[in-house]
Structures are given as C-alpha cells and as structure tokens.
C-alpha cells in the first residue's frame, strides 16, 4: 500500500479510511477543474484543496468523514455532467475526463457501500506519489 499525503492526519489509515476501500480498478469520470490539461493537480482530495487554500471549507466539511480525504469520481456520466454545470460557474474551463481508479494509485470504494446514498459516486484515496492522470483522457 502506498503512502497518503503528508497533510493527512496521523490517524487517517487507522481511524478514518474505511475498511472496505480496496486497490481496484473502476471506470470513472472526473471533473478536471485546474489547468486546461489533465494533470496530477486535478486529483487532489477536498482536504488537500482546503489546506492549500484552493477552495473554502464546504458547509458540511467534517474531518472525521472519509470522503473529506478522497478524490471524488462517478461511474455515471450523466451525474458528472450535472456537477460540471455547477462547477463551470466558478471554473469556466472545467471539463470531464474518463479513466480508471487504478489500484496502484490508491484505494477506492463506492460511497454507497458505506452510506445510505445511491448512485455511482466513488471515493478514491489517492497515494501521495501516485500519477492518476496517466489513466485518464478528456471526454469529447
């Protein structure tokens, strides 16, 4: 298993990371909101974005919630298109990429496996030294 970002709390793996998260490969969609190309920077977790002051703390920000430390993806293109519409208000050059949550880059889990949510949202806890961008391409 790889190492998580240094900014993550010391108890992240023991107390926060869900037991069901595994190094697997799922086909997912991701909103690319930084830069105009698919780069490593576009695969940061919400926690990292807040720490780097790239975004304000969300209203429901909870440092004990596993999804705070994940990179959000979705298995359903229609759902990611909806969120792209919301995102474009603040990031007009954002676009959608498709790829895989390659296990060498981190563990992932369908959010619905641990919450009452439904749908194809995937939490992906990306390792600090991973290069997830190489597994993605722009959706035309």
Residue ranges and their predicted role:
Residues 1-69, 77-140:
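Conserved NAD+-utilizing ADP-ribose enzyme module
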């Amino acid at each position: 298993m790889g190492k998580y970002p240094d900014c993550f709390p010391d108890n992240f793996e023991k107390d926060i990371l869900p037991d069901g998260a595994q190094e697997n490969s799922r086909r997912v969609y991701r909103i690319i909101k930084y830069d105009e190309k698919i780069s490593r920077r576009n695969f940061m977790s919400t926690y990292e974005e807040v720490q780097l002051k790239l975004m304000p703390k969300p209203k429901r920000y909870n440092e004990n919630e596993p999804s705070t430390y994940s990179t959000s993806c979705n298995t359903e293109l229609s759902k990611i298109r909806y969120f792209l519409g919301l995102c474009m208000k603040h990031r007009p050059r954002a676009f959608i990429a498709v790829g895989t949550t390659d296990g060498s880059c981190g563990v992932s889990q369908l959010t619905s496996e641990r919450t009452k949510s439904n749908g194809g949202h995937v939490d992906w806890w990306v390792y600090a030294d991973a290069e997830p961008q190489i597994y993605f391409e722009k959706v035309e």
